[in-house]
Regions:
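Short, acidic/hydrophobic/Gly-rich beta-strand patch recurrent on exposed beta strands
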Residues: 6-11, 135-138, 321
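Short, solvent-exposed loop/turn elements at beta->coil junctions and helix N-caps
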Residues: 105-112, 180-185, 227-232, 418-423
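Terminal RNA-binding accessory module
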Residues: 1-60, 64, 332-335, 341
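Rossmann-like S-adenosyl-L-methionine
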Residues: 200-439
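A short, glycine/Asx- and small/polar-enriched loop/turn
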Residues: 113-117, 189-191, 427-428
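Extended interfacial segments that mediate partner engagement and assembly in macromolecular machines
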Residues: 48-60, 66-177
Length: 439
């Protein structure tokens, strides 16, 4: 999954030996390799020569592939990447959750290049590499990749990487600028790019003038972060319209560079559409959206349901969700609560009332407490459980764990599951699953 071929060494007697992970090798290939780490039960190695290439091998278009840690699978045909991710999902469901989906959904996929609308790039002056570097970390390293372009960033962002290096190198505080975050908003027709610069010392007036000139030249918006996340502010221009659109539902979603939003806007639109179709919301339904964030799912659901309750652990995101609901004229059909869903209990869920449908979209840690609370409710108050749950996941292992609880303890059936290729050319596996309450 991380661009490594997996095999077994043979013992002297011909029996299967320890596992070997070969970076740069693909399934079915015959390669010459060199081990760089040996453990009692496994080895790690790199490819020296490909003797018999896989028919699925392609030439990576990025000159930094293999060094840069931003991508791991550019050498594998995109369709095969999705197939491998699907297999990872199914294997996790089987071996971790002890469950299997009745139906495997058609995968969600889209553009494989220029899709990364959010990114955090490190900044460092490295004299041995010619000066200022701006880029992703090298693979399994704290070093920064010496990169002048990036295939997965939007072309307009990729084009400014070298000028950005030159800009930072010209600042009086160039050694006190550790990172820049990229956030691109996308409406129906236009894009807006914001760069959030982390500064550990104040800018001089000359520095500020340089940032403004860069913004005018590249048509970007500067945000600055002098200390913690709470100190982030729009520097230039001060009025910024940063948003993404969900046109199918007539939703316009404003956000800040520090807000969590999906990296891939095109895939997010498809994901929201499919999730709502799978949720099968009726006009009379009361729906819960757990880990709701800015309201990415909450607001589209509100266009279909009678009422939606969004629950989020971040106070800042809860406030932003309230603002977004009001801006889209949906504040009368939505309600938001700030709760720690990693410690939620059956009593907490019971206090929220009965929901006909539930959408769960947790971070990588998953929704174990929510799943356990639903399992506890099923023992004595099964009538309070939602008939259908749609679970959107960014970690197949925690989805599998929670699926095991929902199926084996809470009385649900895993009806469908499939992958969402939110991060092409990487090992990240996003997925979606549908659970129906058994009668």
């Amino acid at each position: 999954m991380e661009g490594r071929g997996v095999g077994h060494l043979r013992n002297e007697d011909g029996s299967q030996g320890k596992v070997i992970f070969v970076e740069g090798a693909l399934p079915g290939e015959r390669v010459t390799y060199k081990s760089f780490r040996r453990k009692p039960k496994w080895e790690a190695a790199t490819v020296v020569e490909i003797q018999r290439p896989s028919s699925l091998r392609v030439t990576p278009p990025c000159p930094y592939f293999g060094t840069c840690g931003g991508c791991a699978m550019q050498h594998l045909e995109p369709g095969a990447q999705v197939a491998i991710k699907q297999r990872v999902l199914e294997d996790n469901l089987k071996h971790i959750g002890r469950v299997s989906a009745e139906t495997i959904m058609r995968p969600i996929y889209g553009p494989t290049w220029g899709y990364r609308y959010r990114a955090r790039l490190s900044i460092r002056h490295v004299a041995k590499k010619g000066g200022m570097l701006v880029g992703f970390h090298e693979r399994k390293s704290g070093f920064i990749t010496d990169m002048a372009s990036c295939k997965v960033l939007p072309p307009e962002v990729s084009a400014m990487l070298l000028p950005l290096r030159q800009l930072v190198a010209s600042l009086s505080i160039m050694d006190r600028v550790p990172q820049v975050e990229v956030a691109v908003g996308q409406g129906d027709q236009e894009k807006t790019t914001a760069l959030l610069l982390r500064i550990m010392e104040p800018l001089t007036e000359e520095d500020k003038a340089k940032l403004k000139a860069f913004a005018d030249r590249w048509r970007i918006h500067w945000w600055l972060q002098p200390k913690g996340p709470e100190t982030v502010y729009a520097f230039y221009p001060e009025t910024i319209d940063l948003h993404y659109a969900l046109p199918e539902f007539g939703i316009r979603m404003p956000f800040k560079p520090t807000d969590f939003t999906q990296v891939n806007h095109e895939i997010n639109r498809t994901l929201v559409s499919r999730a709502l179709r799978l949720l099968d919301v009726q006009k009379t339904d009361r729906v819960a959206d757990l880990f709701c964030g800015l309201g990415n799912f909450t607001l589209p659901i509100a266009t279909l349901a009678k009422h939606v309750v969004g629950i989020e652990g971040s106070t800042a995101l809860t406030e932003r969700a309230l603002q977004n609901a009001a801006e889209n004229g949906l504040d009368g059909k939505t309600q938001f609560h700030c709760r720690n869903l990693f410690e939620v209990t059956a009593d907490d869920l019971l206090a929220l009332g009965k929901f006909d449908r539930m959408l769960i979209d947790p971070p990588r840690d998953g929704a174990m407490a929510v799943s356990q609370a639903l399992a506890e409710l099923s023992k004595e108050r099964g009538d309070m459980l939602p008939q259908r749950i749609v679970y959107v996941s960014c970690s197949p292992s925690t989805l599998a764990r929670d699926a095991g609880i929902l199926v084996n303890e809470a009385g649900y059936a895993l009806k469908q599951a499939g992958v969402v290729n939110m991060f092409p050319h990487t090992a990240h596996v996003e997925s979606i699953a549908v659970f129906d309450r058994l009668a």
